[in-house]
Amino acid sequence: MNKFYKIFNLKPVINVAGTMTSIGASIINKTSLKSVEIIHDKFIYIDQLQKLASQKISKRLKTEAAMVTASSSAALTESIAAIYSKDDLSKIYSLPKMNGKKSVLVQKGHLVNYGGEVEQAIKLSGANIITTGKKISCSEEDIKKSIEKNRNKILCALYVLSHHCDEYNSLDLQIFYKVCSKYKIP
């Protein structure tokens, strides 16, 4: 047994499930660890580092923006808050209080716990939740009906990619994106 486990009286884990917060999330790969070694003993303006990381990540992923966060839950909360507030400081400072469109559309089967509750991460931003479909199924028609019924409330839509979601009868990401784009929902 590894010395680390003995010193701290911890039980070793054999991970056969993938990335899971409850067992330490991810093991840092060697490339990332080398990057940490380069910067760990230096002070740096975090805004500059965040901007640089955003540019590199968004370029690599071919997205309009990207941001490094502490976890998936933090990413959900911060993304929803950013969609709501954009660069309006008064909205940023008022969070989690939101006015106007403040609901997130999400498939009912995507409100899972992956080490943190998706529902809680959404609510921490100040947003409300509008679910669509059933726990084990969601159709294109379900999404369209939910959007048409709640169009004046929806701030954005959320699609959760996780092995905790039941993919059987879940709406495909591309279809979800196509429908939301048609209604101009981020």
Question: Which residue ranges define each predicted feature?
Answer:
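Conserved PLP-enzyme active-site core in the AAT-like
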Residues: N2-I23, I27, S54-I57, K62-A65, ...
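A glycine-/small-polar-enriched, mobile loop at the entrance of the PLP active site in fold-type I
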Residues: I14-L52
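Active-site/ligand-binding surface loops and adjacent short beta/alpha elements
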Residues: V68
